[in-house]
């Protein structure tokens, strides 16, 4: 299937913790700089971009020099609150190198479930777009207890990114991960696993091919990405799942390169 994203004017990019934090726990500064360059390039072309960024926990562990994620919810919240400040400080600094202004929006599930607060959120996004600002979104981990327990809030930022895409009426959601896309079976187990370039619907076979593992710093796994794709389908939009190793590949994707997996319903 030929890919054409010429009509994309509003884009949501989601980046996971594993793309921002190295296995050693150090921050991947090169990756963040590349991401800022790409988003700034798109911004300069007139494309409105929202960045949904995980990483508060990973940044917090780095700042506090902790090797493992705390077990207690209160400490998880504390570490995330420290990390969120560090992450946004770095984003602001790096984006400024490309003369791009950014803002922080921390959401909780109740914000998008109640009409009044949802309207306020939409107004905030639209105002930021009008001001030429790139919104950087994360869940408010310090008060969203269920995010810490992987339960019933947004659950993880995969789902949050799909919700944000709906809220802002995005033409495309690009989900950056530590995998190349959706395979027909687990590529870490089966050497003959094949990358699916195009997924027009979420079938039982697709669900069965999704695993459940996330990284040690994050909460998301393949199943959460598939569920996000389902939400995108419900919103009559489209999603790309691709490896975040080289953020500059986003530019190639938007030019039509067949990178990652495209989730798009048949016309």
Curated annotation (Swiss-Prot):
Keyword Transferase: yes
GO molecular function, one term: ATP binding
Chemical reaction(s) catalysed: L-glutamate + ATP = L-glutamyl 5-phosphate + ADP
Disulfide linkage: none
Enzyme Commission no: 2.7.2.11
Binding residue positions for ATP: 14, 177-178, 219-225
GO biological process annotation, one example: L-proline biosynthetic process
Compartment(s) where it occurs, according to its Swiss-Prot or TrEMBL record: Cytoplasm
Function: Catalyzes the transfer of a phosphate group to glutamate to form L-glutamate 5-phosphate.
HAMAP family given in the database record: ProB
Protein name in UniProt: Glutamate 5-kinase
Organism: Streptococcus thermophilus (strain ATCC BAA-491 / LMD-9)
Record lineage: Bacteria, Bacillati, Bacillota, Bacilli, Lactobacillales
